[in-house]
Amino acid sequence: MSQVAKKLLVTCALPYANGPIHLGHMLEHIQADIWVRFQRMRGKEVHFICADDAHGTPIMLKAQQMGIAPEEMIATVNQEHHQDFTGFSVSYDNYHSTHSEENQTLSTKIYLELKKNGHIKNRTISQLYDPEKNMFLPDRFVKGSCPKCKAEDQYGDNCEVCGSTYSPTELINPRSAVSGATPEMRETEHFFFDLPAFSDMLQAWTRSGALQEQVANKMQEWFESGLQQWDITRDAPYFGFEIPDAPGKYFYVWLDAPIGYMGSFQNLCDKRGNLNFDEFWAKDSTADLYHFIGKDIVYFHSLFWPAMLEGSGYRKPTNVFVHGYVTVNGAKMSKSRGTFIKASTYLDHLDADCLRYYYAAKLSARIDDIDLNLEDFVQRVNSDIVNKVVNLASRNAGFINKRFNGKLADKLADPALYQQFIDGAKVIAEEFNNREFSKAIREIMALADLANRYVDEQAPWVVAKEEGRDADLQAICSMGINLFRVLMTFLKPVLPSLAERAEAFLNTELTWHGIEQPLLDHQVSAFKALFNRIDMDKVDAMVVASKESINTPQKVSGPLAEDPIQDTITFDDFAKVDMRVALIKQADFVEGSDKLLKLMLDLGGETRQVFSGIRSSYPDPKALEGRLTIMVANLAPRKMRFGISEGMVMAAGPGGKDIFLLSPDSGAQPGMQVK
């Protein structure tokens, strides 16, 4: 009896519905999509779903600021998010919203089951209240210093520096993030999920292989510090689902948000009619459930979520796959620098496959951060996709189309080399399955190098000029095209749009099992350009378009207004200036000048004479003697009527009596270069 193939349900974390998708979000959705596409190519039944996280105070307040209903705002955002993911070829079977009938039904059901099973506790608490806005403040709307590590400007539920969780009342120097007012303490009744009751189950589950080792180790710290009951209540006004039999009380967004996975799948089941919800979510489900998430929401997905499922009679996730953050050019994404790039802005300038490839080339199964270095991005895409892969097709297709009417040879020119490519499929498949995408890409590019070396050695452009060698030419070029086909099959999960164009050229579908049989005596289509090289100008234009536009520029005051920053120079221009630490050995008035002082500067073995216009600020020049300063040492000597000035000392200030000679920190020595 044959074994029944596993069925997979895969999710990404739900984007919050109060803003656009950016390239940080896209890392996760691309990672998951590559994995899903690979599983589908291997014959697995995969259902891939997501939704917008559409509840909470931030959405309520933003809608108020916009003068529209929250429902209207989240509907618009949902459409935009769906459009962005489609533009990046993310192959969701369903993209829904947590503000849905399915999600409300499931949230209510799970809450009532938890309550029936004794896992919901209610008690009166003291909570922070904004006296200006007349509202209780949810934890994300209180800021202050972390009670554990003392980091400033942290939210009221968890610290982004040390990862600790706590209640808003534990914050040091709390303030309302809504109005800035100092909050007051008021009493209110709240409902709590009894998370500590699931401690033993959670400790076993986290060590079962459901989490990466890095994550499981971090969770052990949380277990050792003790789990706390989880407040699942928010007071009106609040945009979300009202708790049954508790007027004016609402489910905290983090209760119904993960249930949104279930709600989106229920919506898909209702649409298709041939999917069974319980087959994937029931306690005895044999299907696999995978969540792709960022490391910032591990606490919710590895503690609250599995405990909620366990306590309400549902199955737990098979695996939670955690990834790191995205930086751009080695730094946090910045609107002012133009590196906070929206998905839609990227798509206005560049091909989605480019980013998919670059992320894949850097992703592993670890939770390390990924840096999107824009110069490296251009170089790698052009080098790998254009020069190594697409060029392999173009340099052979011309001969096949022109000389042989698009017909490939009836036998392989180098069966051993082709078999080497086929043998590589096993390792590449293992790397894709294990989410070690960067390793898979390295294996694929190593094969691409072999393919191009074969073509270089066979030199079809030379063979084409030799009489009587048509059969050799056809065989060589057919071999190159067959190797291109194998490479594109391996890359199909990563580059779906390019793969589609390659399939049109090859006149065949790219399937994992299909590469066992090469294309022999096969008709290919006329070759059309498959992929465009990235122009750095397009990347620069994308960055410019991403810079935050300020409709009403802030009025600049102070020194910057009086002396604006000059035009940008290159690093090479700056590097030409040689600044050195100098010791003022002697300082004197200059006879005949009421502005200049004559300074004798020791550069640690060389003495320079410099005339400087700082007399008005230093009426006693002898007070400068023995002091260290900074001078431009490679400035061309300037002949003055008082003598030759052999450099320039550095000073700040607008002039007159407001001139301030610059000095290095203690420890600097004469002659040291300033870099």
UniProtKB/Swiss-Prot annotation:
Binding residues for ATP: K335
GO CC annotation: cytosol
Location within or outside the cell: Cytoplasm
UniProt record similarity statement: Belongs to the class-I aminoacyl-tRNA synthetase family. MetG type 1 subfamily.
Cross-referenced PANTHER family: METHIONINE--TRNA LIGASE, METHIONINE--TRNA LIGASE, CYTOPLASMIC
UniProt: Zn(2+) binding residues: C146, C149, C159, C162
Keyword RNA-binding on entry: yes
Top EC class of this enzyme: ligase
GO biological process: methionyl-tRNA aminoacylation
Keyword terms: Aminoacyl-tRNA synthetase, ATP-binding, Cytoplasm, Ligase, Metal-binding, Nucleotide-binding, Protein biosynthesis, RNA-binding, tRNA-binding, Zinc
Span(s) of short sequence motif 'HIGH' region: 15-25
Catalytic activity: tRNA(Met) + L-methionine + ATP = L-methionyl-tRNA(Met) + AMP + diphosphate
Motif 'KMSKS' region positions after renumbering to this chain: 332-336
Name under which the protein is recorded: Methionine--tRNA ligase
Cofactors that this protein relies on: Zn(2+)
InterPro entries linked to this entry: aa-tRNA-synth_I_CS, Anticodon_Met, Met-tRNA-synth_bsu_C, Met-tRNA_ligase_1, Met-tRNA_synth, Methionyl/Leucyl_tRNA_Synth, MetRS_core, MetRS_Zn
Major subcellular site: cytoplasm
Source organism of the structure: Photorhabdus laumondii subsp. laumondii (strain DSM 15139 / CIP 105565 / TT01)
A GO molecular-function descriptor: metal ion binding
tRNA-binding domain sequence ranges: 573-675
Assembly, per entry: Homodimer.
This enzyme's EC code(s): 6.1.1.10
Pfam families: Anticodon_3, tRNA-synt_1g, tRNA_bind
Signal peptide from the UniProt entry: none
Annotated cofactor note: Binds 1 zinc ion per subunit.
Function of the molecule: Is required not only for elongation of protein synthesis but also for the initiation of all mRNA translation through initiator tRNA(fMet) aminoacylation.
Record has Protein biosynthesis as a keyword: yes
